[in-house]
Amino acid sequence: MKPNNKMLFIGITGGVGAGKSEILSYIRKHYKCEIYLSDEVAHLVKLPGTECFDKLVKLLGAEILDENGQINKKVMADKIFADKSLLKQVNEIVHPAVKEYLLEHLELARQSGEVELFCVEAALLIETGYGSLVDEMWYIYADEEVRAKRLKSARGYTDEKIQRIMASQLSEEQFRQASNFVIDNSGALAESYRQIDKKLEAYTWQE
């Protein structure tokens, strides 16, 4: 199988409640793709036996481990929030490990010759420097009112929690400036899907 030099490496980002998971589900169903969620990859690179795991235990102590010897996410988060200086150190351990994992699988996908789209989803893709790595950065947009309604309905978030999370993320303007393509996901999903297909219709490998 020849490497697929036409494979697109796409970063999928957007604010909380924008509907990134629905967009990714559609892409997964209709295109020959591999999709990686940064949160899931971060979990994998922190499993026992990895270099990332060893570094985190050395930094934070064995008290972050559960009875099975794995990192307890809540305990680790509580420890980090209690000492903000630890957050930067943890990010400096985890983010490079995630990036290395993704780039290894990117090359494997390209060499397979069978993958058309290699997609990576994360809220912090732009902040963590993926803009210089991806072929295209896609911003999944939905207005704040729509996002807040979704978060209340699907996750039971309070207004205070929603505002706190939104305030910690990039602004709409910052997302747009760093992206090649914007999908307006404020309305019906069918319209969002149409935007995706129109964007990708120029590629001859589309099914």
Q: Where are these predicted regions, by residue range?
A:
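Small-molecule kinase domains that catalyze NTP-dependent phosphoryl transfer to phosphate-bearing small molecules
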Residues: L102, S132, S153, Y157-A202, ...
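The conserved Walker
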Residues: V16
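Short beta-strand-centered segment that lines the nucleotide-binding/catalytic pocket of NTP-utilizing
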Residues: C33-K46
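ATP-dependent small-molecule kinase phosphotransfer cores
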Residues: H43-E114
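Walker A/P-loop
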Residues: S21
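ATP-dependent NMP and nucleoside kinases share a basic, alpha-helical "lid"
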Residues: L103-A154
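Hydrophobic anchor at the beta1->P-loop junction of P-loop NTPases
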Residues: I10-I12
